[in-house]
Amino acid sequence: MLKILVNRKTFLTILILTGTILLLSDRALPAKERRAPLPSVPGYVAVPVHYSHWNKMMMEAVVNVHRARFVVDTGAGYSILDAGRAHSLGVSPVGADSPYGEFANLNGVRYRVGYLNSLRAGAMDFGSGPMALFQPASEDAALNARINGENEDGIIGADILTRYKAVINCYTKTVFFKTGSSEQLHVARFAASQNFKRIPLREEVSRAFTVPASINGHSCRLLVDTGAFITTFDLSRAKEFGVSFTNTRMSGSFADGITRRVAVGNVANLKIGDYQVPPQRLAASVLPDFAVDQGQAKIGGILGMELLAASHGIIDFDSMSVFFK
């Protein structure tokens, strides 16, 4: 049965950085390439994903027998469907007498709720159920930033990913969804045999997911966000940690609707858990307050898609771990 959390508020932040991928072009991901056959794992269904030109992790799906494209987004607390495309996908808003409620309250904004008779991705059958219908022209900049510019139909968010104990292999471009109650993928055992570093993944009060990190020996946490195509530090915090950045002409349009300048700098001493990140150029900007305000967590920035893939990242929502090598 497909369900969605319709009352939980989440931070949802991603920046759209025009030109940043060109400046950091060595970190861009190939959109399409030949892939190995999908593995067969008892108790799990493997679904292929691919990267778009903007490093978004895309999953091909079928909604009510109609083909659709979804962004796989660990930074989105809930899954949504573009209201403008709902009709062509055979999805209509539910009525006032619906047991799921006529409206969903997401990020303080009310959205109509639609009912999906079926949602499938590859061999994975998510079943039927309600999903919030997002209006891109609405005032919710957070969602608008995430479902914009890639011709996608919606977002597969943390509600579905955590419900099915998803294991996201960012390097092999495969997502495993758990369908059996007793089987376990034992990612940690495999990762240890392949010299991966295991990093604990923590859910914050806002339903953001973070990992421990350090910059020049200063402890912080990074938001794990497959919806962010570029790793971006909070500029003030990075400077506080002794990292120098050079201003550029580029700007970023953030989830709070404010456009900010983007800086780039050489980061030589970044550790994520026990994993030492190779020295490289990374971006920084003044991140929105709701991105860095995660209760007691001291957020240093957003861990984006390019670094997750380059580090052979595996995100395991079963053991609540991230693995790098």
Q: Could you say what each language-model-derived stretch is?
A:
Residues 13-22:
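Bacterial N-terminal signal peptides
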Residues 2, 7, 23-325:
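Pepsin/retropepsin-fold aspartyl endopeptidases
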